[in-house]
């Protein structure tokens, strides 16, 4: 339905962003992998999108790389996995790292991603192993880096909670990852990388 958007970044606070396309603001939910590389507010961006309509909601998801959108869609084909876990996957690891985990059958590494337990990880390996090599295909669209938000520590805590971490755990992870002057995307990236170790 809506496959791609090109417009101006009008708002961004993980996991939400608004892209202004000729005066219409499209609100999208995006994984941290996209937020890491978004241009600053007021700059142009092109996003691959995934439109989802359910009985009680309509959602639009945005991705800088086609491979991320493909992985988002494929992960949701696994029984018991929805958009929230698919976003957590893309927020926790790169497409290439996920493909390696699935191809290697690394259940332990997969269970470090929020929302994925042992049985879900086993289903992912079983159902996605044949397609894992295709996940990395699809390049990035050109982008810049964004400015630091007013309070990167609290924004990172909120983003980690939305990825499935409990409030106390999200706050601890953000505090441990935070260094003065860090942008919110950097804090979240360091927190997620630390959690996966």
UniProtKB/Swiss-Prot annotation:
SUPFAM superfamilies with a match to the protein in the record: DNA helicase RuvA subunit, C-terminal domain, Nucleic acid-binding proteins, RuvA domain 2-like
Coiled-coil portions: none
Residues covered by region (Domain II): 65-143
Stretches for region Domain III: 153-197
Pfam families the record matches: HHH_5, RuvA_C, RuvA_N
Cellular component GO terms, alphabetical: cytoplasm; Holliday junction helicase complex; Holliday junction resolvase complex
Keywords: Cytoplasm, DNA damage, DNA recombination, DNA repair, DNA-binding
InterPro entries: DNA_helicase_Holl-junc_RuvA_I (IPR013849), Hlx-hairpin-Hlx_DNA-bd_motif (IPR003583), NA-bd_OB-fold (IPR012340), RuvA (IPR000085), RuvA_2-like (IPR010994), RuvA_C (IPR011114), RuvA_C_sf (IPR036267)
Keyword Ligase: no
Domain I, as annotated region: 1-64
Single GO biological process annotation from the record: DNA repair
Region (Flexible linker): 144-153
GO molecular function, one term: four-way junction helicase activity
Purpose: The RuvA-RuvB-RuvC complex processes Holliday junction (HJ) DNA during genetic recombination and DNA repair, while the RuvA-RuvB complex plays an important role in the rescue of blocked DNA replication forks via replication fork reversal (RFR). RuvA specifically binds to HJ cruciform DNA, conferring on it an open structure. The RuvB hexamer acts as an ATP-dependent pump, pulling dsDNA into and through the RuvAB complex. HJ branch migration allows RuvC to scan DNA until it finds its consensus sequence, where it cleaves and resolves the cruciform DNA.
Family recorded in the similarity comment: Belongs to the RuvA family.
Name of protein: Holliday junction branch migration complex subunit RuvA
Species the sequence originates in: Stenotrophomonas maltophilia (strain R551-3)
Gene name tied to this protein: ruvA
